[in-house]
Amino acid sequence: MPRSLKKGPFIDAHLFAKVETALETNSRKPIKTWSRRSMILPQMVGLTLSVHNGRTHVPVIVSEQMVGHKLGEFAPTRTYRGHGIDKKAKR
């Protein structure tokens, strides 16, 4: 269920402050964040955010199509190593 329009998008205050300073200083350095729950705003387009996936920080370059989505959607937390081998079919 989407968030109510009258509430507006959620973004952590510390992340928003880092984004604002990066825009003011025109910095190209990645912004490291643990806030996977924050929504991507139009001001973030073009920035590089390092989103934590539980083990490492995954670099995410924000584009126009990502606006309105959450940061966690672009940093997968699970690694898929394939299904197990069927030993009966191998014979």
From Swiss-Prot:
It holds the Pfam family Ribosomal_S19. Keywords: Ribonucleoprotein, Ribosomal protein, RNA-binding, rRNA-binding. GO terms for biological process: ribosomal small subunit assembly; translation. GO terms for molecular function: rRNA binding; structural constituent of ribosome. The keyword rRNA-binding applies. Coiled coil: none annotated. InterPro entries: Ribosomal_uS19, Ribosomal_uS19_bac-type, Ribosomal_uS19_CS, Ribosomal_uS19_SF. GO terms for cellular component: cytoplasm; small ribosomal subunit. The keyword rRNA-binding applies. Transmembrane segments: none annotated. PANTHER family: RIBOSOMAL PROTEIN S19P FAMILY MEMBER, SMALL RIBOSOMAL SUBUNIT PROTEIN US19M. Protein S19 forms a complex with S13 that binds strongly to the 16S ribosomal RNA. HAMAP family: Ribosomal_uS19. Belongs to the universal ribosomal protein uS19 family. This is Small ribosomal subunit protein uS19. It comes from Psychrobacter arcticus (strain DSM 17307 / VKM B-2377 / 273-4). The lineage of its organism: Bacteria, Pseudomonadati, Pseudomonadota, Gammaproteobacteria, Moraxellales.
